[in-house]
Amino acid sequence: MELMNIARVRWACRRGMLELDVLFQPFVDNVYQDLSDEDKVLFIRLLECEDPELFAWFMGHEVCPDPELARMVVQVRGRAAP
């Protein structure tokens, strides 16, 4: 998967759940540009997941079955706030 420009990433972060918006928007604004290209691709992969899955992973109700995506979930949760 190729890297998206920042405007497209911001748009992809707009979800159907406010809880996810609150996590993703600050992460993109404050952290995304500093990620390695590999992690940017991984974040984009994460954004392709369905909202109910993302919500369950970020709220700790379920563990993401993909270890790479699980690492990105931890990274977003830990660094989303400024």
UniProtKB/Swiss-Prot annotation:
One GO cellular component, as annotated: cytoplasm
Task of the protein: An FAD assembly protein, which accelerates covalent attachment of the cofactor into other proteins. Plays an essential role in the assembly of succinate dehydrogenase (SDH, respiratory complex II), an enzyme complex that is a component of both the tricarboxylic acid cycle and the electron transport chain, and which couples the oxidation of succinate to fumarate with the reduction of ubiquinone (coenzyme Q) to ubiquinol. Required for flavinylation (covalent attachment of FAD) of the flavoprotein subunit SdhA of SDH and other flavinylated proteins as well.
Subcellular location: Cytoplasm
Disulfide bonds: none
Lineage, broadest ranks: Bacteria, Pseudomonadati, Pseudomonadota, Gammaproteobacteria, Alteromonadales
Keywords, in A-Z order: Chaperone, Cytoplasm
Entry protein name: FAD assembly factor SdhE
Any Pfam family hit: Sdh5
Organism the protein comes from: Shewanella oneidensis (strain ATCC 700550 / JCM 31522 / CIP 106686 / LMG 19005 / NCIMB 14063 / MR-1)
